[in-house]
């Protein structure tokens, strides 16, 4: 594991432990838009991650869910969602995760998802494959929608009419459709072949 992936793993785990320790203890909820929120936990977890990155890689750029952009013209850019699934977290639904991606010259080179509730760490590095808790994983080999279990998530960017049309098409064509409320959880399930 290279230094970048090592820091991403350490930062995700540290933020994830903080999030897990504060599950059910949200003190502050800030509205970021019509159907988008951030909590005090989102902000503190993001700070944990950014501090870990800056200690080791002070010149790298950062694009973070809560605090925005910093030095994004750099060769290396870290993309951070400290608490993906905030709505679930606010409602004490244990489906959320920490998501960190690293881009080098506009190409993804490493990614980490940490699921605090299950202590599951998903890590991938360009050219080295993907792993769950240090065990190699792979995506599903299903290539027909009618045999696939897929995920759909509503988005604040699209109208309800557009979302219902897309969901209807998926529901008609897929074997099964899930809505989990956390892209990090969905992507981790795709990475290990639980979702197609």
Regions found by a protein language model. Give the residues of each.
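DPxDG-like acidic metal-binding loop motif
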Residues: 72-131, 148
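An extended, acidic
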Residues: 138-196
